[in-house]
Swiss-Prot record:
Name of the protein described by the UniProt record: Ribosome-recycling factor
Origin species: Leptospira biflexa serovar Patoc (strain Patoc 1 / ATCC 23582 / Paris)
Family statement drawn from the similarity comment of this UniProt entry: Belongs to the RRF family.
Cell compartment(s), UniProt: Cytoplasm
Gene: frr
Region named Disordered: 134-156
Organism ancestry: Bacteria, Pseudomonadati, Spirochaetota, Spirochaetia, Leptospirales
């Protein structure tokens, strides 16, 4: 029973860490990253479809994203969708693929992005703490079936797991901030 609570908690925390990685992937750092555009929704025969399902997204150079659609007829729609997504990126349609040159970040923009990184990391840390609270609440429901020492031991275990996930988020945050602030 306690193992199930901990397993469920770790699963939720893993998803939270993955969500932060995904959030960070969408933040423009001056380097090309396919994650910047892969979730852009394109009108594909009346259905809004993620760009990564309509073509191959690659980064042939450090500051270039190359999108090669599976259907050449989709080039105009993909171009429109990238403009509509307000990513601050300018797609160049060469007739067979779309190239996006990633401009250098200004010092001011780097500071803004560093703040966004801190904010997103803090949101996920709060989510991790909420997951911990839920796990402790679940543990309290089964308190009558255990001794106080067992309950305390399980709470300590939950806290150690929480601390390790908070540290993971902190590492991801530092890594992304370094990526943004490095010229």
């Amino acid at each position: 029973m306690v193992d199930e609570i901990i397993k469920s908690m770790q699963s939720k925390m893993d998803k939270t860490v993955d969500a932060l990685k995904k959030d960070f992937g969408t933040i423009r750092t001056g380097k090309a990253n396919p994650m910047m555009v892969e979730d852009v929704r394109v009108d594909y025969y009346g259905t809004l479809t993620p760009l990564n399902q309509l073509g191959k997204i690659a980064c042939p150079e450090p500051r270039v994203i190359l999108i090669t659609p599976f259907e050449k007829g989709m080039l105009k729609d993909i171009e429109k969708a990238i403009f509509a997504a307000s990513l601050g990126l300018t797609p160049n349609n060469d007739g067979s693929s779309i190239r996006i040159n990633i401009p250098e970040l200004t010092g001011e923009r780097r500071k803004e992005l560093a703040k966004v990184v801190k904010q997103k990391a803090e949101e996920k840390k709060v989510a991790i703490r909420n997951i911990r609270r839920d796990a402790n609440d679940e543990l309290k429901k089964h308190q009558s079936e255990m001794s106080q020492d067992e309950v305390k031991g399980h709470q300590d275990k939950i806290q150690k797991i929480t601390d390790s996930y908070i540290a993971k988020l902190g590492d991801l945050e530092k890594e992304k901030e370094k990526e943004i602030t490095t010229l």
